[in-house]
């Protein structure tokens, strides 16, 4: 699933291509992705509106449109966008929707496993109702005391706590492993047993890792691509995630993988000993 860096990269690429373009037509091939309303209403809602800017809240892509309209997009497991200046001679597989613009360009949304979602909202309510109502700020936005207080109330292990988008947004399986390795924290450590210094370390490392990944275009693991099939490079700098059996860059112990709370979790058993965390 694309995480914060990947979504940021997609938003940047979309802004470069579709900002200030006006919707002319919308073709919806998979109505299940377009939530709450009939596809015809989605089309009516969008046609004639200009895209003012594209931003994100955590893993959610936010299209800000004229007339105080909002379109939300979540890529879920492997959603992807492709932009064309003019109608392509051939379309890629698994197209779920096509957005046509008045200047003749097209934005295609594709997904081989269609779990992505689209919602339409208005500026005055999009943060007050689902799917964004409970989404927290990202590590670079949240203040330390808020983050610490949320963790101090959670007896749950730190790995699934970091994945909870109501605690802090944008962190998924890849970056949770990397952040905990950088912080020398075992993924099973109860969140409420972490000292303030350790929580500060988590937040600092989260910001640094997510920012660096964003600079490098995200991590192209499995199927991630940003706009027009462009791959990221941060996967070449991962320290533990996907590194089972490889030697730790810090201590030369072998990286282990466990199934934890339903997630494949990578860590160094030497650098991330539980007794060192509290």
Curated annotation (Swiss-Prot):
GO terms for molecular function: 8-oxo-7,8-dihydroguanine DNA N-glycosylase activity; class I DNA-(apurinic or apyrimidinic site) endonuclease activity; damaged DNA binding; zinc ion binding. The active site is at residues 2-3, 59, 263. GO terms for biological process: base-excision repair. Keywords: DNA damage, DNA repair, DNA-binding, Glycosidase, Hydrolase, Lyase, Metal-binding, Multifunctional enzyme, Zinc, Zinc-finger. Binds 1 zinc ion per subunit. DNA binds at residues 94, 113, 154. A zinc finger (FPG-type) spans 239-273. The keyword Cell division does not apply. Monomer. Involved in base excision repair of DNA damaged by oxidation or by mutagenic agents. Acts as a DNA glycosylase that recognizes and removes damaged bases. Has a preference for oxidized purines, such as 7,8-dihydro-8-oxoguanine (8-oxoG). Has AP (apurinic/apyrimidinic) lyase activity and introduces nicks in the DNA strand. Cleaves the DNA backbone by beta-delta elimination to generate a single-strand break at the site of the removed base with both 3'- and 5'-phosphates. Belongs to the FPG family. This is Formamidopyrimidine-DNA glycosylase. The gene is mutM.
């Amino acid at each position: 699933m694309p995480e914060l860096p990947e979504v940021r990269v997609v938003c940047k690429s979309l802004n470069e291509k579709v900002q200030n373009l006006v919707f002319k037509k919308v073709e919806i091939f998979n109505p299940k992705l377009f939530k709450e309303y009939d596809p015809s209403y989605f089309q009516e809602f969008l046609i004639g509106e200009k895209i003012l800017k594209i931003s994100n809240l955590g893993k959610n892509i936010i299209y800000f449109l004229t007339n105080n309209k909002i379109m939300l997009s979540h890529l879920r497991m492997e959603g992807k966008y492709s932009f064309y200046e003019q109608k392509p001679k051939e379309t890629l597989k698994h197209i779920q929707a096509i957005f046509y613009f008045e200047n003749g360009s097209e934005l295609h949304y594709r997904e081989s496993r269609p779990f992505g979602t689209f919602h339409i909202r208005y500026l005055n309510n999009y943060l007050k109702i689902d799917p964004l109502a409970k989404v927290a700020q990202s590590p670079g936005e949240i203040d330390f005391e808020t983050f610490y207080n949320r963790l101090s109330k959670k007896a749950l292990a730190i790995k699934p706590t970091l994945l909870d988008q109501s605690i802090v947004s944008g962190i998924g399986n890849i970056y949770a492993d990397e952040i905990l390795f950088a912080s020398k924290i075992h993924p099973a450590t109860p969140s409420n047993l972490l000292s303030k210094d350790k929580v500060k370390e988590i937040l600092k490392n989260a910001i640094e890792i997510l920012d660096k990944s964003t600079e490098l275009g995200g991590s192209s693991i499995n199927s991630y691509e940003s706009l027009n099939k462009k791959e990221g490079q941060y996967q070449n700098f991962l320290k533990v995630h996907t590194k089972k059996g490889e030697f730790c860059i810090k201590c030369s112990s072998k990286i282990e993988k466990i199934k934890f709370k339903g997630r494949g979790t990578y860590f160094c058993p030497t650098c991330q000993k539980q007794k060192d965390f509290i």
